[in-house]
Amino acid sequence: MQIGQRLGTPLSPSATRVMLLGAGELGKEVIIALQRLGVEVIAVDRYPDAPGHQVAHRAHVIDMTDAAALRALVEAERPHLIVPEIEAIATDALAAIEAAGLAEVIPTARATQLTMNREGIRRLAAEELGLATSPYAFADSFDAFSAAVAKIGMPCVVKPVMSSSGKGQSVVRSEADVKAAWDYAMAGGRVNHGRVIVEGFIDFDYEITQLTVRAIDPATLATRTYFCEPVGHVQVAGDYVESWQPQPMSAAALQKSRDIAHKVTEALGGRGLFGVELFVRGDDVWFSEVSPRPHDTGLVTLASQRQSEFELHARAILGLPVDPTLGSPAASAVIYGGLDERGIAFEGVRDALAVPGADLRLFGKPESFVKRRMGVALATGANVDEARERAKRAAAAVRPVSSR
């Protein structure tokens, strides 16, 4: 099938089939964007009734780190495209699936392998591409970790080489923190337990996500790189709590950010949207990480852009033209679960939506935890400051409550 020139009808022999590996809140929005273009979507996750399961044509629950189970599901469903949305996947199996011609992996199987592992992407960025990064070292034992901390110096940031949403991430500020940081990283890694990256601490002014799209240029039919306006964000313990767009920054810093994003995404190749995380101080910019898929901080684009990051990703992977134009300054603020319980309810929704320019996304996760992201408030404004105030006010109005 020549995807882009021709799209089929879902649930028919002509269907264009896309399988998402990971069906959380970001995957859910990608599924909705794909379905608006008439794509048949298969959602896969490790637990039942995930947000994306609730809107997909078909849903499956498997251990995606089980290579045999993943291969069997792909052979049964025969998707045209496989779109990884999380880190905990048997990436070697994806490479074998792509090599066998069973499906195309987005953006590529190699890109998925590199970016699911902080070691792979850091070595690519710093050692192959020569991009500015913080000093770093890797360790796979406590003794090696202690030596790495001594080499990098304190304060330093410790992360499992494979984790998401800040899991296992901490800052070592003194010798008293070293053992606790190692133990926390060991508990937080999804796969590849036992290996961490130790990063030197950069005294940055702010962090941004440079959403970068590799998509078709309709004039030439060649792959072209497009940039969204920079997304500013606040993270607590490595997990995003607030984001806004556009982030004010100097012309020099913006150009450096886009140069870095272009180099790393071009090296990864393929089609789709990438979230490139960067540290900025004045006109200086450092590469941090890259995700080859929509980024949690990019939820703000549901309110800010003509096409959200999810629509951009859907169009790009299907070989369709994209438009990353900013429509309005906007912001997002996270709504946490606040309690440990299945099937919670939300009060204050009417009050939240009464905030001028505000909107909500309640993700529909079947189980809440105190610090689990259960929704997000969005808001537009005349400027970023107004949008941030509105988004935070709307988020604060929503009260997760027990349904018992």
UniProtKB/Swiss-Prot annotation:
GO terms for molecular function: ATP binding; magnesium ion binding; phosphoribosylglycinamide formyltransferase 2 activity; phosphoribosylglycinamide formyltransferase activity. Keywords: ATP-binding, Ligase, Magnesium, Metal-binding, Nucleotide-binding, Purine biosynthesis. One of its GO terms (biological process) is 'de novo' IMP biosynthetic process. Pathway: Purine metabolism; IMP biosynthesis via de novo pathway; N(2)-formyl-N(1)-(5-phospho-D-ribosyl)glycinamide from N(1)-(5-phospho-D-ribosyl)glycinamide (formate route): step 1/1. ATP binds at residues 118, 159, 164-169, 199-202, 207. SUPFAM superfamilies: Glutathione synthetase ATP-binding domain-like, PreATP-grasp domain, Rudiment single hybrid motif. It catalyses: N(1)-(5-phospho-beta-D-ribosyl)glycinamide + formate + ATP = N(2)-formyl-N(1)-(5-phospho-beta-D-ribosyl)glycinamide + ADP + phosphate + H(+). It is an enzyme of class 6 (ligase). The keyword ATP-binding applies. GO terms for cellular component: cytosol. Its EC number is 6.3.1.21. Mg(2+) binds at residues 277, 289. Residues 123-318 form the ATP-grasp domain. NCBIfam families: PRK09288.1, purT. Involved in the de novo purine biosynthesis. Catalyzes the transfer of formate to 5-phospho-ribosyl-glycinamide (GAR), producing 5-phospho-ribosyl-N-formylglycinamide (FGAR). Formate is provided by PurU via hydrolysis of 10-formyl-tetrahydrofolate. Belongs to the PurK/PurT family. Homodimer. This is Formate-dependent phosphoribosylglycinamide formyltransferase. The gene is purT.
